[in-house]
Amino acid sequence: MRVAVIPARGGSKRIPRKNIRPFAGKPIIAWPIKAALSSGLFDKVIVSTDDAEIAEVAREAGALVPFIRPKNLSDDFADTKSVVRHAISELKLETEPEVQVCCIYPTSVFVDAQLLKEGLEKLNESKCSFVFSVTSVDPSVYRAFTKAADDRITMLFPENYAKRTQDLPSLYCDAAQFYWATVGAWQSDLRIFGPKSIGVFIDPSRVQDIDNEPQWLAAERKFQEISQSK
């Protein structure tokens, strides 16, 4: 059995009502719901929310909303694992450690069926506990600086002063799109970003933080470019 859990709280601060704001003709949450449904991977596509309007929009997009998330798991400090664990409990899956659960973020407009399938394949073929989306970091933090109170600048890694950028190690960060694991891993003390995790590498052109208006507009431009290229 496989379940997709899309966590979508109603209290977005920087972009109010972000999770159901129109994006390319649909409420933004409808895009990851569509990707999950079209992948054919999941027995259930669940939206975990504390918000009645989000629940209604999610159902209209084809997702299930079998429970309402409590307020204590819907504030700025609620972490992903706690939200997924709550969903696992509500779905009565605590005693089924091999069930596979994919957490997909509600603004993951660039997630598609192929990326979700690649993540599942890596989870099945490896001995890892978590598989999640990653993207490259550019420019490299190995050439980064710190700033003192008097505005003096110091290299964070001065040993790299004379090195060319192309000679520095490649760096990656969380693309904040999806996270695959079994129920057993979600319920464990293992960290999502730990030594038993594997990445699905996504081109930066398909990654965009959406935490403010300029980022929202940038995501819309990227989305339009990708849609027109298909």
Protein language model regions, located:
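Conserved alpha/beta core of the MobA/IspD/sugar-nucleotide pyrophosphorylase nucleotidyltransferase superfamily
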Residues: 171-230
